[in-house]
């Protein structure tokens, strides 16, 4: 571990405030080095944290946390905050089972004012805290720290609109690094990055190209020209940012300050001290660089957004979570990405939509091959779904690639704008089930429950890679709204067809014939069901569809077996197991049924296998639970 004499003194923001302001740049260097060391060992979100070091130090130096409230949007950039608030010695446990969460979590620290993980919630939460303080006659300050990527979501502007009309002491810090996970899209980022600045950069490049050879021959001239160039760039950027941003945010009722260099910690302290003394809604526009201080991350902030580890000093390259070593088995995301490109090559009506998750959802190749049919709408899930509805109305075939946890954010649009009108929109629902290190805010445990009650919806859950392709093709050709949900990570190793074969909608298949006990399994739980069935001589049905569900198969299994076990990687409440019970009740069948899913609990973060075991859904746990449930404890016999 690199020596860090200042950082070693800090176990709380109170310790931080004992430092002289002139010591803060040195502390920032030590904190950045500590991040490189700790994230290099544990993995986790990387580039965004490097870009927020000075801002985090300045905020805790000026504001009286935890009395004053800091609300971090999304939480990708919260590692420096955790280090400065007493969790430095636990950073080696980051995102591991039983260790620190990768996002702010209220039950983890009094300094984590609001639990986050999803985008664009910070302004609304901080506004609620500020309003409470006003009602109680307090004098605390509430601060929302939000990135320019998160500002592309409507919820952020809803909160700005509300805050500007309220007489509360609220500071919104706009951390502008021109990135979310991928480069930002839409009109707002273009608004923040002015045309004048781009024109100035172009002019300077032209001047350099035309005069560089001459200046090289004059001693000292090139160095002087570079200083002038830098000054012109800085002045142009500051003037244009201030002019445009002032107009936007002051029209919302905020007093605008900025733009300010987000890596000049001493100046940030001065600016924040002034802002803390002001009354009413304030907005501070801070310019930072994602990955600051680590050249590889600065040059490729998308790749280094999240990492698995760092190389030893002098190492050539850092492997990223987004580019794992080649695996023999493809991930479900890769299967979807290939199917999407294959389908688009055969059908010019296919269009793909993502809410700012191009890399994570497997759309990089599609964007490269079909740029005119690729739509990244920013962090705007609600708009993504309604936009897809408009495309479908005019004869296009939209595919919305979205994580299960983020589809929750667009539920009204899914119901009102898609399902009630029976529009043929296909939802490719990635990260369904347990996701591991990202924890409960990113777990996809509710989609079967909230999708199967929606009229006109087709809901499918593949059990392996090839079935994923089959069900994508099947649901794409259905003249109805449909969702195919699949888990994070690699599949089972099943050979994947290159064709566009389809299956009958609403029909499952028998994977194994057995006696007495029937496993009715959905999606990712088919594999553990088969493993357990071998030991218990049980029948296994791969249902494929949750809606419409195969009533005929369920009734046949119920009448030919003594008992039924349902398995799903979804909440038990309202899930696929409940659908099976509804079928049995409808047909007047009374048989013992064991529902195996995620109980009514908030899951933790950590290794997915460990989490599944704790939830009773690993093959070993399923076998144990079934044996305990069997009336005669004699397995299936």
Curated annotation (Swiss-Prot):
Binding site for thiamine diphosphate: 76, 117-119, 149-150, 177, 294, 381
Gene3D superfamilies per the UniProt record, alphabetical: 3.40.50.920, 3.40.50.970
Residues reported in the UniProt entry to bind Mg(2+): 148, 177
Cellular-component GO terms for this entry: cytosol
Record key words, sorted: Isoprene biosynthesis, Magnesium, Metal-binding, Thiamine biosynthesis, Thiamine pyrophosphate, Transferase
Metabolic or biological pathway, per its Swiss-Prot or TrEMBL entry: Metabolic intermediate biosynthesis; 1-deoxy-D-xylulose 5-phosphate biosynthesis; 1-deoxy-D-xylulose 5-phosphate from D-glyceraldehyde 3-phosphate and pyruvate: step 1/1
Presence of the UniProt keyword Magnesium in the record: yes
Catalytic activity: D-glyceraldehyde 3-phosphate + pyruvate + H(+) = 1-deoxy-D-xylulose 5-phosphate + CO2
Protein known as: 1-deoxy-D-xylulose-5-phosphate synthase
Taxonomic classification: Bacteria, Pseudomonadati, Pseudomonadota, Betaproteobacteria, Neisseriales
């Amino acid at each position: 571990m690199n020596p860090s004499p200042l950082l070693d003194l800090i176990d709380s923001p109170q310790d931080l405030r004992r430092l002289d302001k002139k010591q803060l740049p040195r502390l920032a260097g030590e904190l950045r080095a500590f991040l490189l060391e700790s994230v290099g060992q544990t993995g986790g979100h990387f580039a965004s944290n490097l870009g927020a070091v000075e801002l985090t130090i300045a905020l805790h130096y000026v504001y009286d946390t935890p009395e004053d409230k800091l609300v971090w949007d999304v939480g990708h950039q919260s590692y420096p905050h955790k280090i400065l608030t007493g969790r430095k010695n636990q950073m080696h446990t980051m995102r591991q089972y039983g260790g620190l969460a990768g996002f702010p979590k209220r039950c983890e620290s009094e300094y984590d004012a609001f639990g986050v993980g999803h985008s664009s919630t910070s302004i609304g939460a901080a506004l609620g805290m500020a309003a409470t303080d006003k009602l109680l006659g307090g004098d605390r300050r509430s601060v929302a720290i939000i990135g320019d990527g998160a500002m592309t979501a409507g919820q952020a502007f809803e909160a700005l609109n509300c805050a500007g009309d309220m007489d509360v002491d609220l500071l919104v810090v706009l951390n502008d690094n021109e990135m979310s996970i991928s480069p930002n899209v839409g009109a707002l980022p273009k608004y923040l990055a002015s045309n004048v600045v781009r024109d100035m950069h172009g002019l300077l490049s032209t001047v350099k190209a035309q005069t560089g050879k001459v200046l090289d021959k004059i001693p000292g001239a090139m160095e002087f020209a570079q200083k002038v160039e830098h000054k012109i760039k800085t002045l142009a950027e500051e003037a244009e940012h201030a002019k445009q941003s002032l107009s936007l945010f002051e029209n919302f009722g905020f007093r605008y300050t900025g733009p300010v260099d987000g890596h000049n910690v001493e100046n940030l302290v001065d600016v924040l001290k002034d802002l803390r003394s002001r009354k009413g809604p304030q907005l501070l526009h801070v310019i930072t660089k994602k990955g600051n201080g680590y050249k590889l991350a600065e040059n490729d902030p998308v790749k280094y957004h999240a990492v698995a580890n760092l190389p030893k000093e002098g190492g050539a390259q850092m492997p990223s979570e987004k580019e794992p070593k080649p695996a023999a088995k493809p991930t479900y995301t890769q299967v979807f990405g290939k199917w999407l490109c294959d389908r688009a090559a055969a059908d010019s009506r296919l269009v793909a939509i993502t809410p700012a998750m191009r890399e994570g959802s497997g759309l990089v190749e599609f964007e490269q091959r079909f740029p005119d049919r690729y739509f990244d709408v920013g962090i705007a899930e609600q708009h993504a779904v309604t936009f897809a509805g408009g495309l479908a109305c005019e004869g296009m075939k939209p595919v919305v690639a979205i994580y299960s946890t983020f589809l929750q954010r667009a539920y009204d649009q899914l119901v009102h704008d898609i399902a009630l009108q029976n529009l043929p929109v296909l939802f490719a629902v990635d990260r369904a089930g347990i996701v591991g290190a990202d924890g409960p805010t990113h777990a996809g445990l509710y989609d079967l429950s909230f999708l199967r009650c929606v009229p006109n919806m087709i809901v499918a859950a593949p059990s392996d890679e090839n079935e994923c392709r089959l069900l994508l093709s099947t649901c794409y050709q259905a003249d109805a709204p449909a969702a195919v949900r699949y888990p994070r990570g690699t599949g089972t190793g099943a050979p994947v067809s290159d064709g566009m074969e389809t299956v009958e909608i609403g029909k499952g298949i028998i994977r194994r014939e057995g006696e007495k006990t029937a496993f009715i399994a959905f999606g990712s739980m088919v594999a553990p069901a088969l493993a357990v069935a071998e030991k218990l001589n049980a029948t296994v049905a791969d249902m494929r569809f949750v809606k419409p569900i195969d009533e005929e198969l369920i009734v046949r299994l119920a009448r030919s077996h003594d008992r039924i076990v349902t398995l799903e990687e979804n909440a038990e409440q309202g899930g696929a197991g409940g659908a099976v019970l509804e079928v049995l009740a409808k047909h007047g069948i009374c048989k013992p049924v064991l529902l195996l899913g995620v109980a009514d609990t908030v899951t933790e973060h950590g290794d997915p296998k460990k989490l599944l075991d704790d939830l009773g859904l690993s093959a070993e746990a399923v076998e144990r639970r079934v044996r305990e449930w069997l009336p005669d404890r004699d397995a299936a016999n």
